[in-house]
Every structure is written in C-alpha cells, then in structure tokens.
Amino acid sequence: SPVPEESETMIANGMVEVISKEELSEAVGFPVKSAQSLPFFPQSIYYTSYWGEMAQIDYANGGSMACFRQSLGEEDNSGDWSEYPAQKSLTVNGCAVTLKGEADSYTLAIWQDGTYSYSLSLSAGQPASVWESIVEGVA
C-alpha cells in the first residue's frame, strides 16, 4: 500500500512547525516580530506555534543559537526559570528590558510592550551594550 505523504505541518504537544513568519502570524493570530540584529548570521530559521498562542523563532548557525518568543499578555514566556548570578535592567524603545546571565555576559532578555511579552535567549552571552541593539532590532 502507498505510504501517505507527510503533511507539511507537524503537530506534537500543541506545537505546529510552519515555514515562514507570515504563516506563524496566521497560526498564533497576531503579527509576529523577529530578531533582525543578532550577533551572528542565522543560516537556519525555524518557526513554531505553541498551542496557537505563542510564537517561537529559532535561529542557528553552527554552534550559535538564538530563541525568540512572542505571546499576548505580560507573562514571562521564556520558559527559563534558572537562577542567574547577574541581572540588569535597561530601557529600549520605551520598554523595560530585563537581562539575565553572568556579569556583563547576559544570555536572556525578557520584556513587554503593553500588548505582547517577548523573550530572547542566546547560546553565547553578550554585554548589555550588544543586547541593546539586539532588542532594538526586534521588529
């Protein structure tokens, strides 16, 4: 008997992988932003909808990785409950951004804009000055 073709959309645990930012926006029901000023050039980009409520975009290039999340509301959507030794607050585009990581080598940023919550994690820590331009580049 013929093997059924795999559909383009894989659904597991409420996760749906799609192929573009536009499809991701449709899947979650709001316009999804993306990280456009990462400290590395992404060779691979993966788009995932979680439960039709949270957008996740994963960026990768070799060992360098970034994970961007956007959801409605003001909840921390990072899924990262680690205790970090260092935390710093800065204001970017009028939003209060919390950086977490090692002293002057932060790997996680969390912020809200009044409508959406955002988080961005990096595999390699960056100083606050670099994070400022990374967060400014989320559009």
Q: Which stretches of residues belong to each language-model region?
A:
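Short, solvent-exposed recognition patches
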Residues: 2-117
